[in-house]
């Protein structure tokens, strides 16, 4: 679905028109519409920051019967849907990780995943908070303590691309948090096996079970539980519209399961000035566009000195040689460029758009970090492509999309924890605080609340008089 921008005024100057000239697969990288922020009304800017609407009504109609079937028939339903959708016949739906050996990988591949593991582990371990206890009044002590979520489900997509990096991003914080049961769901290969890179990452990061299924049936199996799949209490991970719909339905069902965040197509917003390399700008835009035809790609140009022709040529050149260039082409067809007078206007628009990924590729990029309010993850400076965060810098790549960065955070260690508050009062504490509580309870007309305090205060007073 493309973004409806028909009521916005296009720039009078030529659009960025991108063509691959001699495409290998019969596709053409489409043009990106262009707009000048200073010429748009506030309502037009609001339209520009809106994402394509997803009509979930038809998707729910498909997903609901799958969820019901898995609830009723468990593993058999998972097998049936896996054969129908993935053309794979499963003998076994769930693998116990303790029974699987660590797969052999090429040394360079193993080293890459090991470096990523170490960086992701270090960054998420540093998120552990120390327990703090506060004495608000004499004898009144309060604290907040954390506990791991007992069982979690991790969804690792396997549709248009295999994503072992997502296994690391989800399993490592679960491992650090101390989640006892960690179920990783991922579509099986045609022979019913698990992608060896995903298996390696899962073993390294402490996954306890692998559910060899994808789509809505995998989400339902983790939410309800089956004979072989443990029921989980929270489900994490990106997926297509059917996966997203299943998560939305199940979090509001009798399954009593929560989810990480709402999800939409992946997206990037790049802010660039005349100091940014056109080669890097093009590469960053295309690295997001290649995710899929529904990816959202936005370029914000600062000032009038950016060489748009050079960017056009680079996008055409790089798109032409990409194996997934057809996906990139379709994504670019509903993407756009906006022109900002300065960095203040550029960042103001970015904060309105609230991108999943925000790249700041301008001179002295670091000094603008303090103005950024809404973004899933930020990449600052010419040497920080989005790819490093996607794979191995240490930050998490499971992030809010679709503008949800205005109110949601990406996956972190806290996502796998729950927090309890604890309070304890001494006799002196209740003498100090109790009368105020009794007064407030009386104002609200809750006499039992009041008595729970006053009965104790009377006993304390009686002991003192004895």
UniProtKB/Swiss-Prot annotation:
One of its GO terms (cellular component) is plastid. NAD(+) binds at residues 155, 217, 240. It is an enzyme of class 1 (oxidoreductase). Substrate binds at residues 266, 288, 291, 357, 390, 444, 449. One of its GO terms (molecular function) is NAD binding. Gene3D superfamilies: 1.20.5.1300, Nitrogenase molybdenum iron protein domain. The active site is at residues 356-357. Binds 1 zinc ion per subunit. This is Histidinol dehydrogenase, chloroplastic.
């Amino acid at each position: 679905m493309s973004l409806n921008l028909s009521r916005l005024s296009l720039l009078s100057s030529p659009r960025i028109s991108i063509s691959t000239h001699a495409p290998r697969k019969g596709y053409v990288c489409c043009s990106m519409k262009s707009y000048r922020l200073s010429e748009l009304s506030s309502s037009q800017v609001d339209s520009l920051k809106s994402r394509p609407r997803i009509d979930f009504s038809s998707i729910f109609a498909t997903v609901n019967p799958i969820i019901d079937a898995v609830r009723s028939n468990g593993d058999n339903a998972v097998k049936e849907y896996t054969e129908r959708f993935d053309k794979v016949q499963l003998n076994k739906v769930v693998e116990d990780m303790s029974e699987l050996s660590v797969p052999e990988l090429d040394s360079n591949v193993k080293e890459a995943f090991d470096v990523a593991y170490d960086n992701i582990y270090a960054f998420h371990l540093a998120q552990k908070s120390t327990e703090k206890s506060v004495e608000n009044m004499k004898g009144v002590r309060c604290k907040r303590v954390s506990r791991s979520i007992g069982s979690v489900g991790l969804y690792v997509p396997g549709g248009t691309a295999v994503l072992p990096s997502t296994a690391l991003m989800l399993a490592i914080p679960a491992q650090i948090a101390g989640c006892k049961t960690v179920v990783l769901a991922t579509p099986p290969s045609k022979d019913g096996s698990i992608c060896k890179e995903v298996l390696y990452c899962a073993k390294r990061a402490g996954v306890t079970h692998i559910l060899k299924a994808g789509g809505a049936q995998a989400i339902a199996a983790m939410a309800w539980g089956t004979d072989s799949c443990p029921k989980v209490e929270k489900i994490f991970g990106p997926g297509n519209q059917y996966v997203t719909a299943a998560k939305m339905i199940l979090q509001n069902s009798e399954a009593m399961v929560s989810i990480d965040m709402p999800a939409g197509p992946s997206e990037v917003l790049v802010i660039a000035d005349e100091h940014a390399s056109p080669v890097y700008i093009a590469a960053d835009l295309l690295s997001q566009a290649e995710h899929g035809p529904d990816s959202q790609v936005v370029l914000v140009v600062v000032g009038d000195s950016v060489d748009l022709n050079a960017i056009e040529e680079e996008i055409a050149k790089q798109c032409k040689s990409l194996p997934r260039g057809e996906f990139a082409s379709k994504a670019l067809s509903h993407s756009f460029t906006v022109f900002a007078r300065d960095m203040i206007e550029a960042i103001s628009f970015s904060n309105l758009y609230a991108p999943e990924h925000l790249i700041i590729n301008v001179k002295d990029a670091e000094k603008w970090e303090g103005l950024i309010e809404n973004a899933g993850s930020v990449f600052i400076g010419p040497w920080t492509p989005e790819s490093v965060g996607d794979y191995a810098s240490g930050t998490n790549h499971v992030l809010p999309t679709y503008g949800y960065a205005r109110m949601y955070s990406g996956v972190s260690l806290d996502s796998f924890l729950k927090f309890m508050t604890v309070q304890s009062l001494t006799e002196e504490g209740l003498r100090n605080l109790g009368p105020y509580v009794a007064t407030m309870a009386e104002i609200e007309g809750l006499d039992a609340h009041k008595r729970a305090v006053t009965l104790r205060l009377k006993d304390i007073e009686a002991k003192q008089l004895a």
